[in-house]
Amino acid sequence: MSATPLSRPALPEGWFYPDDDTARDLHAELQRELPPGHLLAGQPVETFAWREGATDDALFRHTEESDRFTVIHLSWLGRTEINSRHPTVEFDGTFAGFLADEERRYGLTPPDGV
């Protein structure tokens, strides 16, 4: 459910790799919230990272498309959302695109070497 240590690039400031329990909890909440028609409904993903702080953002990697990542803003309702636009998709694309989106949105510069 979480990314393996060998496949872990540097993350932007404020993002962290989850421990196994956190990865499992984030993935389980995502699965509870996903309604039919959502971008991730039926898509195999693994918890890749999460943003620390007041946000409920988690970065999921598509297991069948290793360079596709989706940032989801979880609602933590503990049940299926009724609107297919929720939980909210904040980003969907490559890891490089994720880094660029973080920089654009929050002024967070990509880590060195990326």
Task: Write out the residue ranges for each language-model feature.
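Amphipathic protein-protein interaction modules
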Residues: L39-P87
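Glutamate identity and glutamate-enriched acidic tracts
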Residues: E13, E29, E33, E52, ...
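Intrinsic disorder and flexible coil segments
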Residues: S2, E33-H38, R51-T55, D92-F95
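Generic ordered-secondary-structure signal
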Residues: W15, D19-T22, A54, R105, ...
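Charged/polar, solvent-exposed surface patches and flexible loops
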Residues: D25-R32, T47, G93, G97-R104
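Negatively charged, low-complexity tracts enriched in Asp/Glu with abundant Ser/Thr
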Residues: S2-P44
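Helix-rich interaction surfaces within compact, conserved domain-sized segments
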Residues: R68-G113
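Classical N-terminal secretory signal peptides
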Residues: M1-S2, V114
